[in-house]
Amino acid sequence: MQNNSVQQANISIMSSFSGSKKVYVEGSSSDIQVPMREIALSPTTGSFGEEENAPVRVYDTSGPYTDPEVTINIQEGLKPLRQKWITERGDVEEYEGRAIKPEDNGYKKAKPNVSYPGLKRKPLRAKAGQNVTQMHYAKKGIITPEMEFIAIREHVSPEFVRDEVASGRAIIPSNINHPESEPMIIGRNFHVKINANIGNSAVTSSIEEEVEKMTWAIRWGADTMMDLSTGKDIHTTREWIIRNCPVPVGTVPIYQALEKVNGVAEDLTWEIYRDTLIEQAEQGVDYFTIHAGVLLRYVPLTAKRTTGIVSRGGAIMAQWCLAHHQESFLYTHFEEICEIMKMYDIAFSLGDGLRPGSIADANDEAQFAELETLGELTQIAWKHDVQVMIEGPGHVPMHKIKENVDKQMDICKEAPFYTLGPLTTDIAPGYDHITSAIGAAMIGWYGTAMLCYVTPKEHLGLPNRDDVREGVITYKIAAHAADLAKGHPGAQIRDDALSKARFEFRWRDQFNLSLDPERALEYHDETLPAEGAKTAHFCSMCGPKFCSMRISQDIRDYAKKNDLSEAEAINKGLKEKAKEFVDTGSNLYQ
């Protein structure tokens, strides 16, 4: 592990955007400090003088990386923000934990210099007979510091947060062994969230690249991260990511379990899988994607599909079921998995192993048969007070999207829905971040709680840093559009502020209020790079004479100067121009 290269790679990430600063809103106690990004705005100027514009505060996922007062050494990890809250509840205990084995990283014998140097504390687990999930506390009527933190972030009451979690309509992914994470919530009555996938593979990428991608993704707005590593150094890569990640981290444990049996699905066992769950639980993974709904009798339903089974986890479990001609150990041992989850407060992300991989397969019998089983498993998890969200498709044309949400809400009793897109057409490799963002905005509007991003590299290759940025921004647009359509409180404040800045030609404010300030500035400066252009009352699209907003502004100024309404000003101006035309000889061409 080249520690210096990781540190160097993150230097550019550890800064806020231009015109912004990190601010904190304090809760009921001094240790509840909720981060927000405050965007300063310049005053409105005109013939009337100056009028101040209040700063705009926006949701911030970047963690302490963008706080100039915080020094971060990624070899040591972030400070354990939630450690005191977790231990003060008195229901957890330290223990030695399992020893790290060479096979955890995909080796037959230990490889030197790949372990994470920073973690010194022992793992935590629930004391015997205790349940440490946020859902358990919520059902008991307890408002935790995590819930209060979230209430401030979401501009709702702590009691509302508690009630949504208790009902199962929302989850707070918060493993007690990931105290570095800043509490967040996933539920349809809150801001639509987005997830970014990272992870190495047997073909490409490294620990350095994945840590950099993580910090890069949260800078641009990723609400959670999923580490989907499948190559070597899986355990160590995950440790580096979790120790330095201020947002929840999810995984698909079957990927690592498969590596431990050299990629032979038939050789997987419950014992190997269980050991992998505990390994990742002790590291601090906040939610597990588990494809427990892939049943033996559902596999034949995929035989006539255009694209068969496209989920990696789903294909692994289908292969195991066929080889052993029995139901998967994920299904038969589901209650035991629940026992593990509630010891660490890990949320289920019940995987859609039979999701459609093409629009031709959307909403078919296999997809909805699995959904019925996910609904049954949700009820079992809730009996253990384990938090659950449900994964969804996939590839779905626009006219079939709403049916997915309606069925999921009914069958899974409003557990949060977490979808990959969906892609609304299959003809645009290289642009699937766009084909999927169309579906993501729609499904978010209908009630999906979290959207898994898609990058331009989808179906083509492993995304690099630039692809991650493109995917995150694209999905922030989709999520925000859904928030606006749902009428989420305060969602339109930023839009209105940017629209006002645009009308008043406050170019710097326009850049700073945008989801990607750097791209907005870059595109503006390609044609108008001079500093004076940042105050000009036009852009290169229309030029100074044809700018509709400048003309509108001139009308307003004229109306104010002549004590007229805007309609009267337009009418008066038309009469003056008509008289000017007649006075100059009524010639069309001068």
Swiss-Prot record:
Pathway(s) per entry = Cofactor biosynthesis; thiamine diphosphate biosynthesis
**Which positions in this protein are listed as binding substrate?**
N197, M226, Y255, H291, S311, R312, G313, D352, G353, L354, R355, E391, Y418
Reaction(s) this enzyme catalyzes, per UniProt? 5-amino-1-(5-phospho-beta-D-ribosyl)imidazole + S-adenosyl-L-methionine = 4-amino-2-methyl-5-(phosphooxymethyl)pyrimidine + CO + 5'-deoxyadenosine + formate + L-methionine + 3 H(+)
Q: So where does [4Fe-4S] cluster get bound?
A: C539, C542, C547
Segments spanning the bilayer are none
What is its induction behaviour? Repressed by thiamine and 2-methyl-4-amino-5-hydroxymethylpyrimidine.
Q: Which GO terms describe its biological process?
A: thiamine biosynthetic process; thiamine diphosphate biosynthetic process
Could you say which residues bind Zn(2+) here?
H395, H459
Q: In the UniProt record, which is one GO cellular component term? A: cytosol
Pfam families (alphabetical): ThiC-associated, ThiC_Rad_SAM
What is this protein's function?
Answer: Catalyzes the synthesis of the hydroxymethylpyrimidine phosphate (HMP-P) moiety of thiamine from aminoimidazole ribotide (AIR) in a radical S-adenosyl-L-methionine (SAM)-dependent reaction.
**PANTHER family per record:** PHOSPHOMETHYLPYRIMIDINE SYNTHASE, CHLOROPLASTIC (PTHR30557:SF1), THIAMINE BIOSYNTHESIS PROTEIN THIC (PTHR30557)
Task: Supply the name of the protein.
Answer: Phosphomethylpyrimidine synthase
Source organism per UniProt: Bacillus subtilis (strain 168)
